[in-house]
Amino acid sequence: MIDENNLHGILKKVMIMKKKCALYASKLVKDGMVVGLGGGSTISYLIDYVKDKDIKVVSPSSKTVLLAQKMGLTVLNTQYVDHVDIAFDGCDEVDSHLNALKSGGIHTQEKIIASMADEYIVLVDESKFHETLTFKVPVVVEVLPKAYSVVKKKLEKLNGNVELRTASNKDGFLMSDEGNILLDVYFDGVQDIRLLNQTLLMMPGVVDTSLFVDILTGMILVNDKGVFKKERNGEFYAL
């Protein structure tokens, strides 16, 4: 039987930690900046902290766009932006080398924004940080529809357990905003993250993957002891 009081306490603790992480991230946002904002609850808290700043926002997340507009922020269409001062995002896992794994399915758009950003920082609590990625969530592979069968076969040859992502609110499979198929691929015992990502990207018909390798410039991590930042090739330091 679930202890509701204990569950409520855990959820409240997580919320407080996420708000603290967002608060420290907001201190990096200055007037005049173009800011990239991903998706998730921590980003929602960040929007609340920066809503009164003179900034412009780009986002791959429709929910984030709607919330930012509701809060009075100017949202730009990514199509017309070629530079972002700083971008923040969440992830399912991040490791000590700043490799990250996401499962939201909007990774191609997230990477476009990351490529424009001077800084691309993930905001996480300690449950998301691992010395190396665990791959407990799937690698999402975005595939051109006509390449579905051949890519699926190649993924299975790599010992990937492939699932066609389906829509929870309608019959049929789920497609990306660009009209491509999303495959959830579960891998066990990944030894070389970089090699896996390169192998996937080299498959004809693969648009991109939800593995973020050599993309993050930093992470802000919150735990019971405080808020810490880590930059590429650096150690954690307290904020």
Question: What annotation goes with each model-predicted range?
Answer:
Residues I2, N6-D89:
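N-terminal active-site beta-alpha-beta segment that forms phosphate/nucleotide-binding
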